[in-house]
Amino acid sequence: MGTEGKAGRKLLFLFTSMILGSLVQGKGSVYTAQSDVQVPENESIKLTCTYSGFSSPRVEWKFVQGSTTALVCYNSQITAPYADRVTFSSSGITFSSVTRKDNGEYTCMVSEEGGQNYGEVSIHLTVLVPPSKPTISVPSSVTIGNRAVLTCSEHDGSPPSEYSWFKDGISMLTADAKKTRAFMNSSFTIDPKSGDLIFDPVTAFDSGEYYCQAQNGYGTAMRSEAAHMDAVELNVGGIVAAVLVTLILLGLLIFGVWFAYSRGYFERTKKGTAPGKKVIYSQPSTRSEGEFKQTSSFLV
């Protein structure tokens, strides 16, 4: 009770100081008692905004989520997209039911009608949503000595989930995980934010069954399906056999070309001509004028 009383007195002192300061300086002050608000999805919440030092205040509320900006309240009036579930009062705005799309930063902006006086305050709203069942991507087979990346993700949790990995039912995220017998000869890193499990390099001890878990501090932690990964040796014998087969085929091709050339096949092809029509012309015998007879003959 004593702690709550001290906090209340401190809050009252801060608020009083802001009011007195605004009166002395002739400037308006805008204040909120809740700069960071968390509320479960589908419940109601009021975002408060208190101001002083404005003779004729005009209040606006702005919503920012990433690169998206929207007006919730303009000139003390709720805008159309929010009209069915948000109400305005001089002390703030009230959501009748929030969804995960309402996550973001809300700014209360107060100004004079003439624009000579201005103040603002921001409130970060987090809509609490438990994580859904995560999905994983695990290669069924990886070569020892190579790099392997296993991924885990879910897209419903708010705030965003953090991820942990398990191999054969043993947690890999604990500080002493690499000191245990199961992971002593393994080289891996885990990014709890992205959900990536990276082996670099893969060792023979990394074969096993893997699954991940997602949790965000709200609701129940969710576990993925399990998937098996095999760490296999590089198939040197197969590579050597493939190279030998390639060399044999190349040798046979070279021998075939040499054999055809040695038998004169290419020379005959180059010098030979396709059989065609032959024309034989014989000189006509001397005859008297007027007696003409064709004596040319054509052989085909």
From Swiss-Prot:
Modified residue annotations for Phosphoserine: S282, S285, S288
Localization per Swiss-Prot or TrEMBL: Cell junction, Tight junction; Cell membrane
Extracellular domain ranges by topology: 27-238
GO cellular component terms, A-Z: bicellular tight junction; plasma membrane; protein-containing complex
Pfam families registered for this protein in UniProt: Ig_3, V-set
Domain named Ig-like V-type: residues: 28-122, 134-230
Cystine bridges: C49-C108, C152-C212
Gene3D superfamilies for this protein: Immunoglobulins
Gene Ontology MF term list: integrin binding; PDZ domain binding; protein homodimerization activity
Transmembrane spans: 239-259
Protein's membrane topology: Single-pass type I membrane protein
Cytoplasmic-side segments: 260-299
The family this protein is said to belong to: Belongs to the immunoglobulin superfamily.
Subunit note: Interacts with the ninth PDZ domain of MPDZ. Interacts with the first PDZ domain of PARD3. The association between PARD3 and PARD6B probably disrupts this interaction. Interacts with ITGAL (via I-domain). Interacts with CD151.
Family annotation (PANTHER family): JUNCTIONAL ADHESION MOLECULE A
Domain remarks: The Ig-like V-type 2 domain is necessary and sufficient for interaction with integrin alpha-L/beta-2.
Protein name from the UniProt record: Junctional adhesion molecule A
Native organism: Mus musculus (Mouse)
